[in-house]
Amino acid sequence: MNVEKYTERVRGFIQSAQSLAMREGHQQFSPLHILKVLLDDSEGLAGGLIDRAGGNSRAILKATEEALGKMPKVSGSGAGQVYLAPATARAFDAAEKAAEKAGDSFVTVERLLLALSLDKDSEAGQLLTKGGVTPQNLNAAINALRKGRTADSATAENAYDALKKYARDLTQAARDGKLDPVIGRDEEIRRTIQVLSRRTKNNPVLIGEPGVGKTAIVEGLALRILNGDVPESLKDKKLLALDMGALIAGAKYRGEFEERLKAVLNEVTAAEGGIILFIDEMHTLVGAGKADGAMDASNLLKPALARGELHCIGATTLDEYRKHVEKDAALARRFQPVFVSEPTVEDTVSILRGLKDKYEQHHGVRIADSALVAAVTLSNRYITDRFLPDKAIDLMDEAAARLKMQVDSKPEELDSMDREIVRLKIEQEALKKETDPGSKARLVTLEKELADLEEKSAALTQRWSAEKNKLSDAQKLKSELDALRIELANAQRRGEYQRAGELAYGRIPELEKKIAEIEANENSGAMVEEAVTANHIAQVVSRWTGVPVDKMLEGEKEKLLRMEEQLGQRVVGQFEAVHAVSTAVRRARAGLQDPNRPMGSFMFLGPTGVGKTELTKALAEYLFDDETAMVRIDMSEFMEKHSVARLIGAPPGYVGYDEGGVLTEAVRRRPYQVILFDEIEKAHPDVFNVLLQVLDDGRLTDGQGRTVDFRNTLIVMTSNLGSEYLVNQPEGEDTGAVREQVMGMVRAHFRPEFLNRVDEIILFHRLQKSEMGRIVDIQFARLTKLLEDRKIVLDLDAAARDWLAEKGWDPAYGARPLKRVIQRSVQDPLAEMILEGSVKDGDHVAISAEGGVLTFNGKPPHTAEVEPFTGRPPKRMLN
């Protein structure tokens, strides 16, 4: 026996058979051990051959295991020594002769199996005969498997049934009803059929953006081939999808990948046009299997493609086609491009209507038609970085999954009731141990309350179970209906018209009627929602994008109508600005905003400290309940010409290309937010050129060529231009003249095309002395919040309020000096008192003003007088 004459798999099986004999304690290495490992093989080559030869591989395996169990076992010193049985030596000899006779260079698995069946004296041969296997039938099965090929390499078995291993039969999947229906796309399917019908270079490649339905077109072609809805040249063809991952996986040695691919191509060529090969992600062919000196997959395909022996359909994206396929001109010319564009909104609605039944059956919930329309329109508007119909299908799928999860979960009403029952039962057990009259009286009341709750809970549980069962019944009926429709289609193809008639006019209408009855009995007051509606779709969109597109609740409508009042509580004395921002938000939430522009773009002009940035923070807190939920870009960081790249990302070839831009990345991650460009006049003029597209079209292309959507953002720019005019404006003077002076400066600094795109330019007036009291209240509310954890309560009387307002008012600097006054006059003394222990946690501190100083609980603090800075330590430190 020359081991080198055996293929790698046969060597592996012989080694496994020897290990089995040693493990079982058998002294002889018999043909039974070989038969056992051959039948245990996960790929099932030997088992498949036995079944094809008319035998029963499972029965033979069971009989082999029983025979091995009866073999004598050796333990002790003689264990572990295995001798070759004469029958095994005969089997190896017969296998080598059979291989030589067939012209094989190597002994393969099937030759070894044939040798076992030829030896009628061995127990393995007798078991094969009893199992219905004859050498003649087995030889015929081997020849059918080999298709005239000889074993010329140590991995020859990899070439057997290559298409079964490395491809998926789409026509069979269509026959089994595993493919989703394909709606529309008639033009693309017709163009694909036209290219396939050519004499040479009959290989279409479907090129389109990800998610537009390239693979679906091929599945549609498989369904058409199955239904005979194709020209004569394509009738009865098989459409197989090549699995590149399976081809490459496990190919350890050089040449193994090429051998597998060549085996696939040989089978396709041998079919003489009967097989069309579909290669999804076709760009993976270029460079696949490439190693030093080896050919890649695309070079192996080229000759067969050029001769027209290989019918092939490719599919890839525009970017990948340009990057990989177009560079290889010899490969590109062998394929005929078929461009697949994104379907229109109307076409996508039709596609979703065709898929609806499959998704209803899978999730066990009903999907309303309004939900399908909402999925298409909302995904088209708000999910801009993906393509129809993929994003609309994903929306429908997730909304249905979310509803199904709610149906399977206990309703909130029942859940809270059950939790209350558990709480009362714990209390009941505790009261049972008490003997005082009060506890006994409470126990009687509690038991009555508990009995009532348990009765209500039982009724609700029963009602919930009934509703769940109804949905479950509908799902089962829909699954049954789907199976019957597949059976009907197959019966019509086979010409079994009697069975087709029974199904079409009997069982199918009967099931449809039952489903209609269940759905007609929907209860408006049901505990669980039974259908996916447009609002469910809107909720999913809101989760994905952060854009509040779901239906406004009454509370939110009320909140929007009172927006000025809410923002006015934080921003004092700037009603014009607050009103302009509020109307923009209301317009957007009511759906009256131009869908191709940002929600609003404002330029806030005014002196420092009057509330420009504060209004933006208040707006972010109002919209998102978090004042940090905004992109704040300090434009003083963008004073150089090259700093524009930091906003949108560096172009290709520059350092930081992969990192993305400050502005574009923030909006891509969170499309619904406030964007604040602080101190915009300090930026380089070229920065404004970048903003032109954002303000006008609501979009911006970043350094990597991706389009970022700004249509759901609110853009605020702040500037101090012309603030000196506003500061020096006498009280009561007409603001019109001052506005004209300020606008003159703005026009001199910014270009007309930039200013023309801003929705509103709003002037912030300097703060009046009368408004300082309200600002004191706002600042004090923040200080009180800081002391909440210590339970220290501050009580500020009117005198102290007026004192702080007087000291903190400065027309040139707005409200910021007030913050410093509160810090020095209130926070600093208070901090000392807390550290000294004169103010403890939970204390009440009354703050007043007497004799021109603030008092704390009637006493002036050490630091009541604010000393001017002289460069020397304060007097109190010298005392």
Swiss-Prot record:
Annotated region (Linker), positions in chain: 343-546
Subcellular location(s) per record: Cytoplasm
Residues of the Clp R domain: 3-148
Pfam name, any one: AAA_lid_9
Region (Repeat 1): 6-71
Presence of keyword tRNA processing: no
One GO term describing the cellular component: cytoplasm
Coiled-coil regions listed in the entry: 393-525
Region annotation C-terminal: where it falls in the sequence: 767-879
Protein name: Chaperone protein ClpB
Source organism: Rhodopseudomonas palustris (strain ATCC BAA-98 / CGA009)
